[in-house]
Amino acid sequence: RFACEDTPEVKQMILDINAQVPEAAKGLHEESIIIDQCNFSFESYSWNLAESGITALAITSMDTKADAGVAIRYLADDISTIHHNADHMLLVEKPDDILRAKDENKVGIILGSQNCEFLHHNDLDATVYLFHKLGMRIIMPAYNHRSFAADGCYQSANAGLSNDGKKLIAALQKYGVTVDLSHVGERSTLDALEMAEKPMIFSHSNPKKYVDH
């Protein structure tokens, strides 16, 4: 299931709202590549995912406190769901897969995490390589609080990246895992951006001037 409740009343309400959307807006939506950058768990393909018309869905595959073993189990669950819904979904492993999802009228699933603790190891290059091979394509260096790599946005010390954090950022970029800086503290964010060799994202954030979180 997704964010909306799967009941007849909710379904009808959403369909009624969508029916009021102007045809020009519907056309723009249909021809555009639409990526939902922040979603949580999912169980199967459903009517509300079809109705959304999105091209790709970035999934937070695991709990923010998951260790490596738990993370692998969560990833296996998500990949199993994709495989069991292969007529409607595909795993996004490279940018062209998003274009392929659009062409094939499927939803591309991007596997990600809003923390990095499951990667903690004396060889971060190796663990990033491993989880990239398992399909992960978006990882956040910290979620609100301090991780081994960075300070989150709720951490009053507001420290920058740790030494391991710098190794993590380097490895993520090396293997093509997108760095997501939502929930990351200001100094850690700026440190990461200083290291940026590839685009980094703020998947669900806003400009500080607009709302200072």
Locations of the language-model features?
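N-terminal hydrophobic targeting/anchoring segments and the immediately downstream early-domain regions
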Residues: 1-141, 147-157, 210-212
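Histidine-centered catalytic micro-motifs
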Residues: 34-41, 184, 202-205
